C-alpha cells in the first residue's frame, strides 16, 4: 500500500505545457517531502483525456493509496485555490486532449450530485501557514480536474485538489538585484505541508475504521 499519491495533468488544448504535471513530479521527488512521509510518494501525471480516468487513474486508485493530493492548472485564477468539492457535472463544450467531450452531462448518472473533501479546510490552513495566500473554492470546473476529483473523493481516502494559476515567467534580476524564487519551487515547498496533512489523516483512517469495526463486532456479539 502506498502512502500518498500525487497527481497532475499533461497538456491539453490551450495549455500545451501544463505546469501541474511538472509541479506534481517536482513535489513527489522532493527530499523534504520524503522526509515528512518517511517514504517516496507515488506520482501520476494523467493524460488530459476522459478515457484516462479509467485507463490511468483507476489502476492507481486500485493500489489503495492512503491519501491523494491532486494538482491542476486554472489559467483564470490569480492564486492557489483549494477545491472543497467535486460535482457530478461535465461540460460538453470543452474537448479533451484527444478531441473528445463528455458523453453525458452527469459524470456518474447514478452518483451523488457532489462529493466534499473533509480535509480541504485543514489543507488551506497549512498552505497559509506555509506562506501561500490560498483561497477556498467550491468550483473545480466542469473539465477533467473536476471529473478526476469527483472520482477520487468517491474512494473515501483523504483527498484534496489544488488549482494553481499559470506561473509567471521568472525574469532576470537587474544588476545587483536578487533573483526571485520560481513559483513552482514556492508551491512545491508549500504543497509539501498539504501532503503532510493528508498523510496524517490517511494514517489515522485505518485505525478509525478498525475501531469502528471492533465496536460493531462487540455490539453484534
What kind of feature is each model-predicted range?
Residues 140-145, 166:
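Small/polar glycine-rich anion-binding or flexible loop at a beta-alpha turn
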Residues 163-171:
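An accessory alpha-helical subdomain
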Amino acid at each position: 500500500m502506498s502512502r500518498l499519491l500525487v497527481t497532475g495533468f499533461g497538456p491539453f488544448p490551450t495549455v500545451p505545457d501544463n505546469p501541474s504535471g511538472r509541479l506534481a513530479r517536482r513535489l513527489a521527488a522532493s527530499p523534504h517531502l520524503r522526509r515528512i512521509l518517511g517514504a517516496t510518494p507515488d506520482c501520476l501525471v494523467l493524460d488530459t483525456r476522459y478515457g484516462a480516468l479509467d485507463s490511468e487513474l483507476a489502476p492507481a486508485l486500485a493500489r489503495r493509496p492512503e491519501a491523494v493530493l491532486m494538482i491542476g492548472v486554472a489559467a483564470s485564477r490569480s492564486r492557489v485555490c483549494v477545491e472543497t468539492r467535486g460535482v457530478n457535472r461535465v461540460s460538453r463544450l470543452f474537448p479533451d486532449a484527444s478531441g473528445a467531450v463528455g458523453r453525458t452531462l452527469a459524470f456518474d448518472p447514478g452518483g451523488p450530485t457532489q462529493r466534499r473533501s473533509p480535509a480541504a479546510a485543514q489543507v488551506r490552513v497549512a498552505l497559509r501557514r506555509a506562506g501561500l495566500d490560498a483561497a477556498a473554492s467550491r468550483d473545480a470546473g466542469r473539465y477533467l480536474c473536476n471529473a478526476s476529483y469527483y472520482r477520487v473523493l468517491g474512494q473515501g481516502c483523504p483527498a484534496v485538489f489544488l488549482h494553481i494559476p499559470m506561473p509567471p515567467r521568472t525574469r532576470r534580476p537587474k544588476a545587483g538585484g536578487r533573483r526571485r524564487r520560481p513559483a513552482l519551487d514556492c508551491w512545491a515547498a508549500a504543497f509539501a505541508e498539504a501532503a503532510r496533512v493528508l498523510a496524517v489523516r490517511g494514517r489515522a483512517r485505518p485505525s478509525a475504521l478498525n475501531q469502528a469495526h471492533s465496536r460493531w463486532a462487540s455490539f453484534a456479539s
